[in-house]
A protein has these predicted regions:
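Short acidic, Pro/Gly- and aromatic-enriched capping/linker segments at domain boundaries
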Residues: 4-20
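Formylglycine-dependent sulfatase
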Residues: 21, 26-400
């Protein structure tokens, strides 16, 4: 890849272990430096020479890149929804709020485009990794010449890490014995804590640290990955800061929330239930979110709301009392998951602030990789695996 050339910054005595340099950007990856010492027959006549250590430019910002999963445009309060997302709102109030960002309709393609800066087909992800084919653009392989932002920043001296969902490893390489070339650690991310695939049980996930499977939930009934992931990210940031406070970090934070299965803690379910956000039903909720979005300016003020699709979903007033109870319970679980996830993201950001590094940290918080998911059908399901296997549970069966 070719980038715009920059002035090279150097420090220390040339050829000594203390020497550092920044990259010009003319060529990525940078060519190996030529040996600058002297080699003679005798050690006393020879002169050692160390290649300068590559460091980022002075005042290079830290980067915290956050993306949630299957969260729609009208879900968070930041964009007019009723589910409280104070962390996202805090960033919106002190930064910029984008409402014209585009994603693909699937997890893997959006994520491949995000980490490579390329069209998802160019990065090998025309579909999710589980549906890969042996054709260009659809093989689920990020080629070596499609460097990730992790690889580029690592080569420029950043500490790089990936927390949460990895849906960009080919399904045929998602094994505890590898190969690991297309795992996060093989794509330029020095540290990985998360799961490989489209989703995970948040209580007992198929969890890895780097490429080693771990089981931190064993013997801990209240353990949840949403919290554990934030804990591990905070621990990692503290270690980077303690060992080399001058080293900027790039942290890719991609939780499994709010992709099914929806696994918030009971504490968060109770919090959302007590707010009674959904008691008025989906017709009034839709109108309220629509008006909120116009008020916030995230949709044009003259936008017209489409008629309710009664041929597909009946009006709330036509639902039975038992149906209303079921649907409210479903959405409260989802909302609790969204709010819980936003809270834990806030803890990570607070850790950055506690280090005194918030003002020099670029934070990007993307609300959902592909919008609200249609998985589960129009009336939802208590069993995601059953739905994926073609078993749709009618409302009557769910209420039993």
């Amino acid at each position: 890849a070719v980038a715009t050339a920059k002035a090279i910054e150097t420090t220390g005595t040339p050829g000594s272990p203390s020497a550092t340099t920044t990259l010009s950007g003319k060529q990525l990856p940078a060519p190996d430096p030529k040996f600058g010492g002297v080699i003679k027959d005798g050690a006393l006549q020879s002169k050692a020479w160390w290649a300068p250590r590559i460091v980022p430019p002075k005042q290079a910002p830290n980067i915290l890149l956050i993306m949630t999963d299957d969260s729609g445009f009208g879900v968070p309060s930041t964009f007019g929804g009723v589910i409280p997302t104070p962390t996202m709102e805090r960033l919106a109030k002190t930064g910029l709020r984008y409402n014209n960002i585009h994603s693909t309709a699937l997890c893997s393609p959006t994520r491949a485009a995000l980490i490579t800066g390329r069209n998802h087909h160019s990065a090998g992800f025309g579909v999710i990794s589980e549906q890969a084919t042996g054709f260009p653009g659809y093989n689920s392989i990020i080629a070596k010449d499609k460097a990730t932002i992790g690889r580029i920043l690592l080569d420029n001296g950043f500490a790089t890490s990936w927390f949460g969902k990895d849906h960009n490893t080919p399904a045929f390489e998602a094994s505890a014995i590898g190969p690991f070339g297309h795992w996060p650690t093989g794509l330029g991310f020095e540290y990985f804590y998360g799961f490989v695939g489209g989703d995970a049980n948040q209580w007992e996930p198929n969890l890895f640290r780097n490429t080693t499977q771990i089981y931190p939930f064993q013997g801990k009934p209240g353990w949840n990955l949403v919290t554990a992931m934030a804990d591990d990210a905070i621990d990692y940031l503290n270690r980077v800061n303690q060992i080399d406070p001058s080293k900027p970090f790039f942290l890719h934070y991609v939780p499994g929330a709010t992709h099914a299965p929806h696994h918030p803690t009971k504490e968060w379910v109770d919090k959302i239930h007590n707010l009674h956000l959904f008691d008025d039903g989906w017709n009034k909720l839709r109108e309220r979110i629509f008006e909120n979005q116009k008020r916030l300016g995230v949709i044009p003020a003259n936008t017209q709301l489409e008629p309710w699709p009664t041929k597909v979903i009946k009006n709330w007033e036509d639902c039975t009392a038992e149906e209303k109870k079921l649907f409210i319970k479903q959405v409260e679980i989802f909302a609790a998951y969204e709010a819980y996830n936003d809270y834990e993201i806030g803890r990570v950001i607070q850790a950055v602030e506690d280090m005194g590094k918030l003002d020099n940290t670029l934070i990007i918080y993307i609300n959902g990789d592909n919008g609200t998911s249609a998985e589960g059908g129009l009336t939802g399901t208590p069993n995601e695996v059953a739905w994926f296997n073609g078993v749709s549970l009618p409302v009557e069966a769910q209420m039993k």
